[in-house]
């Protein structure tokens, strides 16, 4: 089956549209997150999203609508912890991640059990993408992209030098909060496609790959975006061809590209 035939299926078209947009958003946000050493926040939020979706399924409400405010609140709290010198941010993120997973597992075990819907949210499924999911993903992803572009220069400033940014009158906390909220939205939107357990890889891997190939912030951002979208399309194609889980296949593609970039970096130094 060729690629054109593969994407003639409606569920693959929905997966491609939503996946490309989520991958693009995740890569753009991943660069400042990794540079600011906030990358573990993305991983923590992915576990929070699992706990939220478990509660949503148990209550019989729409998981996405329930998860968005919960994960945004968690992002706000994690950001405050990360900026507070009295707290160990890594420990706080680990505690929230473990607690969210535990809550999710307990809720599932006492209510619906491991249903197909829960499994899809945990590990991702192209078949799980409905038209409503795609429309919501498109609208919110476009909002994330527009906000990132509008505040690009300010995000650049707070990423590299918060002290100087404060001295120039920039509201650093405001833009850090914006970054956390946009990340939370992206994590929730990617849950259906990639799975809550793997969505954070879309935030981390493209940024790490780009940072080994480019030195300028703009170069890293562009490279991360291109890499993320390309790896998603490659992973989606391989997943369909070999009947493998979408999330895991996309992560494997990201990992392969990252290892290749590391090899290129070593050859450059040599």
Question: Which residues does each PLM region occupy?
Answer:
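Membrane-interfacial amphipathic/re-entrant helices at transmembrane-helix boundaries
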Residues: 1-24
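Loop-to-helix entry region at the N-terminal start of transmembrane alpha-helices
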Residues: 11-18, 118-145
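Small-residue-rich segments of transmembrane alpha-helices in multi-pass membrane proteins
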Residues: 48-58, 96-107, 128, 172-183, ...
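Transmembrane alpha-helical segments in multi-pass inner-membrane proteins
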Residues: 193, 197-248
